[in-house]
Design a protein with these regions (language model features):
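Active-site neighborhoods and metal-handling regions in enzymes and metal-associated proteins
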Residues: 1-466
């Protein structure tokens, strides 16, 4: 938790960016994984609640009165029976003091606060809920059915929160760098131990263990697989085979809940084949191009599209694509190989603020999301600003089901050499991902050390440990 003045200043700035009414920011509750009171999923506080209050205990709600410039922390103290099982914890008033608030109230009083605002014609602002218990809580407090809450959420509050959270301060960048340091250890450990005969699940479990031992936990479900063509393939009992590529997409969350997110693809046996190098070098070139051009004022959408053009040109050199590059990209033919966006924002969420709505977080009045397959998965397209933290993550994938589907429909046959693509159906996929900070005149890697990604560096690093 940062110094309480940080949270006081953030809440004051939030009030200034709002017109009037009452802001209600819901913290998260514990969530049982199989039955109540035993066996909970790991607790994770809501990120916007964390940003403005910094408190990691479950069952809390923050109330900010815009008009009267007052603040209150709502929550119930635990009783002696809970203390027996879980130990002593800070009281609600103690936690309020830690975040610079003096007024507290039990949860039963929250409805009266909301009713008073409503009865005096003042708007109750809340963010879009994403957990069922918060949706039920909002229904009980405001009478809004869960199916209508996304539309009823305060757009004014959404935009105000995004405007504050999207540009990271120096103290936030320092925390992200700490998460990146853990991420470096996770990925280099995966490279060090990967070899034929191990299972994906074994290596993935070791990667997760590194996150838990050095930080809070992993920032999302770790992807470790030799089937890199599956975008979000969880580790399974597949046995790693010599000649295949292992894809590791993993990140850490540090004790302040800031995230890292990296992807590396490397040969199971430590040596790339020529065929693998040809595809890998294209992804590497796309990754490095984005690093060269990312800077304040540049549309991230344009960077993404130029990466698609570069990838198409190089796939044409291998004979996998053909025809006019611009026509192929405009038609979306490249998306058979790259069906996702170039990158996303990152911070307290690995996909930062995604619950607030893609149209507000990654896009704006200037540019809105595409509806075209592949490009519609781009999570951010707006102009970069100094202080943005982005991921740079191009990839090339050979997805058998997608290849068969498009070929059966005759899609983009003027741009895709299906006969040659057929010979790559057992190739898998390659993705390279790094976390970058948009600086005053460009961008830089986050973290003190860069996880090896140039082919010779990858092979040399793995050779030291095989």
């Amino acid at each position: 938790m940062f110094n309480k003045e940080i949270y006081t200043q953030r809440r004051e700035e939030l009030r200034k960016r709002m017109s009037n009414g009452v802001i209600v920011l819901f913290g998260n509750n514990e969530s049982p994984c199989n039955y109540p009171a035993n066996g909970y999923y790991p607790f994770r506080q809501d990120s916007s609640f964390l940003y403005y209050f910094g408190l990691r205990r479950d069952g809390l709600v923050g109330v900010i009165d815009i008009d009267n410039a007052t603040e209150m922390l709502i929550g119930d103290d635990i009783d002696i029976e809970d203390i027996v099982w879980y130990g002593s914890v800070d009281s609600v008033s103690d936690m309020a003091a830690q975040t610079g608030i003096t007024a507290t109230a039990p949860m039963k009083e929250l409805k009266a606060i909301c009713d008073k605002a409503h009865n005096t014609g003042r708007k109750v602002h809340f963010l879009p809920p994403y957990r069922y218990d918060t949706k039920i809580q909002i229904m009980d407090l405001l009478g809004i059915h869960p199916s209508q809450q996304k539309e009823a959420a305060s757009v004014e509050l959404i935009k105000a929160v995004i405007s504050m959270r999207q540009c990271k301060t120096d103290i936030e960048i320092a925390e992200i760098e700490k998460a990146c340091a853990i991420g470096y250890r996770m990925h280099t450990h995966a490279m060090q131990m990967t070899r034929p005969g191990l299972t994906e699940k074994y290596v993935g479990g070791q990667v997760n263990g590194m996150a838990h031992s050095l930080g809070e936990h992993e920032s999302f479900a770790t992807i470790f697989t030799q089937h890199g063509e599956i975008m979000h393939g969880n580790p399974s009992y597949n046995i790693l085979e010599s000649g295949r590529l292992a894809l590791c997409d993993a990140g850490a969350e540090n004790k302040e809940n800031y995230c890292s997110d990296n992807t590396r693809t490397f040969p199971v046996n430590g040596k790339f084949t020529q065929k693998q190098l040809e595809i890998y070098s294209i992804v590497e070139a796309c990754h490095d191009y984005a690093l060269e051009v990312a800077k304040p004022g540049v549309l991230w959408y344009d960077v993404h599209m130029n990466v698609c053009r570069l990838m198409t040109e190089k796939l044409k050199e291998l004979g996998l694509m053909k025809g006019d590059t611009e026509a192929a990209v405009q038609a979306g033919a490249h998306a058979m190989f790259l069906p996702h966006g170039l990158g996303h924002m990152m911070g307290l969420d690995v996909h930062d603020m995604e619950g607030l709505g893609q149209n507000y977080v990654g896009f704006d009045e200037e540019i809105q999301p595409s509806t075209q397959f592949g490009t519609n998965a781009l999570r951010c397209g707006k102009r970069l600003q100094e202080g943005f933290v982005m991921t740079d993550e191009p990839g090339i994938y050979f997805i058998p089901d997608l290849i068969d589907d498009w070929r059966s429909q005759g899609l983009h046959k003027d741009f895709i050499n299906y006969e040659l693509v057929e010979t790559y159906k057992d190739f898998g996929g390659i993705r390279l991902e790094d976390d970058i900070l948009i600086t005053k005149d460009g961008c830089r890697f986050l973290g003190d050390n860069i996880i090896p990604y140039h082919p010779k560096d990858v092979e040399a690093f793995m050779a030291e440990n095989l």
